[in-house]
């Protein structure tokens, strides 16, 4: 569900539907290329040195961006150049050069359980994380997200649709999905003080989402 930016020489290129969206949102010229199919493939691009500004604009509009880099020198590659996703930038995980130090970026994982919602909330610039419970109520959920300046929430597939719609009504909050909420053994020391089962599940959901979107760039 992310717009994919492919590094091709001195440019990052987008194709197909991603190109149509990016050209509209970023005021880029939409072109096309022959790719062995009946119709020309829609495409657009941005210079590599201007990438940060374009990603920032997309993230501010609620989009997620996957950055695909060349993993080998094209001059030395045998056949197709090896490429891989090195990072996924989302509204709730935007850090480093894209981060505005004057404002805090908060990501929340929300787990629905019998008596309410369990939340794990992370401030991305410091990594400070809190866990809490709130009543299973649409208005209370909306107020909690707004009060804590949440930019993005992470939920599991199958999360109650009426609450998803309520979050979508808050245009400043993006919604993402993550399937895994189990905490790997190497990360268990991070949540030693979280004993509540639902809160621990929310913490695990958030942690796995961060690993999924951010850890590639650390390898």
Language model regions located:
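Basic, polar low-complexity surface loops/patches
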Residues: 1-219
């Amino acid at each position: 569900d992310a717009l994919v930016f492919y590094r091709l020489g001195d440019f990052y290129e987008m194709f197909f539907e991603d190109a149509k969206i990016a050209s509209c949102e970023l005021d880029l010229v939409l072109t096309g290329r022959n790719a062995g199919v009946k119709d020309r493939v829609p495409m657009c691009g941005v210079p590599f040195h201007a990438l940060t500004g374009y990603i920032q604009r997309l993230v501010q509009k609620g989009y997620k961006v996957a950055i695909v880099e060349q993993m080998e020198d094209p001059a030395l590659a045998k056949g197709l150049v090896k490429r891989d996703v090195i990072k996924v930038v989302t509204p709730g995980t935007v850090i480093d050069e894209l981060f505005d130090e004057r404002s805090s970026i908060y990501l929340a994982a929300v787990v629905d359980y019998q008596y309410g919602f369990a939340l794990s909330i992370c401030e991305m610039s410091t990594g400070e994380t809190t866990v809490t419970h709130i009543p299973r109520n649409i208005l209370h959920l909306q107020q909690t997200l707004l009060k804590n300046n949440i930019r993005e929430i992470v939920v599991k597939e199958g999360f109650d649709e009426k609450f998803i719609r309520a979050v979508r009504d808050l245009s400043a909050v993006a919604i993402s999905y993550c399937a895994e909420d189990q905490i790997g053994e190497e990360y268990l020391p991070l949540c030693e003080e979280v004993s509540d089962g639902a809160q621990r599940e929310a913490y695990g959901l958030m942690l796995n989402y961060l690993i999924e979107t951010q850890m590639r760039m650390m390898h």
